[in-house]
Curated annotation (Swiss-Prot):
Similarity section: Belongs to the IspD/TarI cytidylyltransferase family. TarI subfamily.
Keywords: Cell wall biogenesis/degradation, Nucleotidyltransferase, Teichoic acid biosynthesis, Transferase
Designated gene of the protein: tarI
Record-given protein name: Ribitol-5-phosphate cytidylyltransferase
Classification via NCBIfam families: PRK00155.1-3 (NF001183)
Length: 238
C-alpha cells in the first residue's frame, strides 16, 4: 500500500492574530489545505490519503473539504499528535487499523502548508521510497550556512556545496520508520522533531529527491504574500 500523510497539525502561532490555523487561511480563493490535498488527489498511486489535524479542528477540516467538493473515498481525516512524529505515528496506526501493515507499505508525508509541490516531486518520492526505504526532499543551499552553538559567535561554516535545505515530502517504508521511532528513548522523541533524522541517527540511508525553490512552507504573513505572488506570477510547473 502507498499512503499519503498530510500533516495539518499547526496552530499558526507565527501568523499573528488570525482566527484559524494557517492551513485554513485563504490562498487565491481557497484554503491552503485544499490546494495541497488537490495535488495528492492527482496521484492515482495513493491507496489512502490521511489528513492529520488537531482534534478540535477535525470537523472543520471535513467541512472545508466538503465545501470545496473534495469527496474522494481515499481521504480520511484523523487526529494528529502532540508533535510531528507522533502525528505520523497516529496516521500509521490508523492505516494499520484499517488494512494492517505489510513489509512493503510506504508513506509519503507532507506539510499541509506546502501547497506548491509538484507531480514530479510526488512521483520521485514514491519511486525512491519503494526502492530505498527513506527519502527526503531538498533543494541546494544558496546562502552560506553558519553554525553557532551559543547564538553569539560562529562555530563553523560548512562547505556550501554540501549543504541542502530540507522540504517535504519526506517518505518512508512504514515499518522502517516505526521501528526506528520505537527504538528512541522518550527523551530523544521529545527533541528529535525531524522524521528523517530518526533514520539518520539509526544509521539508515536516506536518499535525496530534489524539490523546487517555490515549494515553500507558509508559516508567516510574509510567506502568504510570497505564495500569492507565486500563483499570480505563473511560476508553477507540474
Amino acid at each position: 500500500m502507498i499512503y499519503a500523510g498530510i500533516l495539518a497539525g499547526g496552530i499558526g502561532s507565527r501568523m499573528g492574530n488570525v482566527p484559524l490555523p494557517k492551513q485554513f487561511l485563504d490562498l487565491d480563493g481557497k484554503p491552503i489545505l485544499v490546494h495541497t490535498v488537490e495535488k495528492f488527489l492527482l496521484t492515482s498511486e495513493f491507496d489512502k490519503i490521511f489528513i492529520a489535524t488537531p482534534q478540535k479542528w477535525i470537523s472543520h477540516t471535513k467541512d472545508t473539504l466538503r465545501k470545496h467538493h473534495i469527496t474522494d473515498d481515499r481521504i480520511e481525516v484523523v487526529q494528529g499528535g502532540s508533535d510531528r512524529n507522533e502525528t505520523i505515528m497516529n496516521i500509521i496506526s490508523a492505516a494499520e487499523k484499517e488494512n494492517g501493515i505489510s513489509d512493503d507499505d510506504v508513506i509519503i508525508t507532507h506539510d499541509a502548508v506546502r501547497p506548491f509541490l509538484t507531480r514530479r516531486i510526488i512521483k520521485e518520492n514514491i519511486e525512491s521510497v519503494l526502492k530505498y526505504g527513506a527519502v527526503d526532499t531538498v533543494i541546494t543551499a544558496t546562502d552560506t550556512i553558519i553554525t553557532s552553538a551559543d547564538g553569539d559567535s560562529i562555530q563553523s561554516i560548512p562547505v556550501r556545496s554540501e549543504m541542502y535545505q530540507g522540504q517535504t515530502p519526506q517518505s518512508f517504508n512504514v515499518n522502517l520508520l516505526r521501528n526506528s521511532y520505537n527504538d528512541l528513548s522518550d527523551e530523544d522523541k521529545q527533541i528529535m522533531t525531524d522524521a528523517c533524522k530518526i533514520l539518520v541517527v539509526a544509521g539508515k540511508q536516506v536518499k535525496l529527491v530534489m524539490g523546487e525553490l517555490y515549494n515553500i512552507k507558509i508559516t508567516t504573513p510574509y510567506d502568504l504574500k510570497v505564495a500569492n505572488s507565486i500563483i499570480k506570477g505563473g511560476m508553477l510547473s507540474d
